[in-house]
């Protein structure tokens, strides 16, 4: 008899803006990437390789019909087990391997100046503000 690997739980949150946040629980094999987890949770569009814009990997261009544009864009965040808060991964979603129970959130940002994106986290609504974890070190 073959033994199967343990499954992991992934909570996928999608914040469309205007207080519209959706949550989907997934059970998956360890090693699934963040893009595949999103694809299981929503109807998505993405470009498989954005190396022309110096993003070496896939970029999400639409989730459930909410498309990127000049002032609209999707950013994803991760909240790993035993971590203090949400963080911005420094890689494209197809490169981020999820190996343990994790929360992944996608937020549809509408901004002309970027300040909102830098200050508020993935689940911010008019009634609840979530902040993102920051690193103050200079690189």
Where are these regions (language model features)?
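Ubiquitin-like/PB1-type beta-grasp interaction modules and other compact soluble beta-rich domains
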Residues: 1-139
């Amino acid at each position: 008899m073959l033994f199967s690997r343990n499954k992991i739980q992934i909570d996928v949150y999608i914040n469309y803006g205007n207080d519209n946040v959706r949550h989907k629980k997934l059970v998956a094999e360890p090693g699934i990437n963040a893009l595949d987890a999103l694809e299981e949770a929503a109807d998505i569009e993405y470009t498989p390789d954005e190396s022309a814009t110096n993003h070496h990997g896939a970029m999400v261009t639409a989730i459930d019909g909410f498309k990127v544009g000049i002032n609209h864009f999707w950013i994803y965040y991760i909240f790993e087990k035993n971590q203090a808060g949400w963080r911005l991964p420094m890689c494209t979603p197809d490169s981020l391997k999820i190996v343990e129970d994790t929360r992944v959130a996608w937020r549809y940002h509408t901004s002309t100046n970027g300040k909102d994106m830098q200050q508020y986290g993935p689940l911010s609504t008019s009634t609840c503000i979530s902040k993102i974890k920051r690193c103050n070190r200079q690189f």
